[in-house]
Regions:
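N-terminal loops that bind phosphate or other acidic moieties
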Residues: 1-74, 78-219
Length: 219
């Protein structure tokens, strides 16, 4: 069991844990362990400023220890930033029309004018598995915002604005990384973190129960 200092959905330093196999090749972690919805009382939740950066910190810690495979559980996040925070932690920079650096959040999605990947250090030669039973795509009435946004604190009168921001973000990712992250089943998981892992980092989505069966030897 590894202890790591990361950040919660609102940028506060928190310690969390994840597991590394005895041979050091496999890391198993969960987004909810650092940016979980249940970590913040309902009356204090603000998904409009929440970021997935903490997940990126946790992933980078595992990579720094030499892990070649990461299984990451998607679900229960307090965020709806489309994984913008994860990408920023791996060196991707987002700027507005004034060339001002944007802090990852729902508010920032619609302001993105330019994405700079020149200094990005995305995972290479690493297998990433998303443990995810959710098949929802990033966008649409069955997407991240409309299906899961309410439980995170997004009000009904904010939904369309947030969805437009997410669609704009999706377009900017396509321009930068030449992939439509909305195409992937599960891209809407964990507030859209799935879109970055599956689309940009070329992860594989596997249902949670299938992983349990595989690693427990159950039939």
């Amino acid at each position: 069991m590894i202890d790591v200092l990361t950040t919660d959905a609102y940028g506060k330093n928190v310690f969390t844990k994840y597991c590394i196999s005895q041979d050091g090749n496999l890391a198993v972690m969960d987004v909810a362990s650092c940016i979980g919805l249940n970590m913040t009382p309902k009356e204090k939740r603000n998904p409009m400023i929440a970021s997935s950066k903490g997940v990126g910190i946790m992933m980078k810690d595992a990579l720094s220890r030499g892990c070649k495979k990461i299984i990451i559980g998607l679900g229960g996040s307090a965020t709806n930033d489309g994984g913008m925070g994860v990408l920023s932690e791996f060196g991707v920079r987002f700027y507005n029309s004034k060339r001002e650096l944007l802090v990852p959040s729902v508010y920032a999605l619609s302001q993105i004018a330019f994405v700079d990947k020149r200094y990005a250090r995305l995972p290479k030669d690493v297998e990433i598995i998303c443990a995810c039973d959710v098949k929802n795509h990033l966008l649409g009435k069955n997407g991240a915002t409309y299906v899961f946004g309410k439980q995170k604190g997004i009000y009904l009168n904010q939904m369309s604005e947030v969805e437009r921001g997410m669609a704009h973000y999706c377009m900017k990712l396509k321009q930068t990384f030449h992939v439509n992250v909305n195409e992937f089943e599960g891209s809407g998981a964990a507030g859209g973190i799935g879109s970055v892992l599956l689309g940009v980092m070329q992860a594989k989505r596997v249902s949670g129960i299938d992983l349990v069966v595989e690693y427990s030897g159950l039939k």
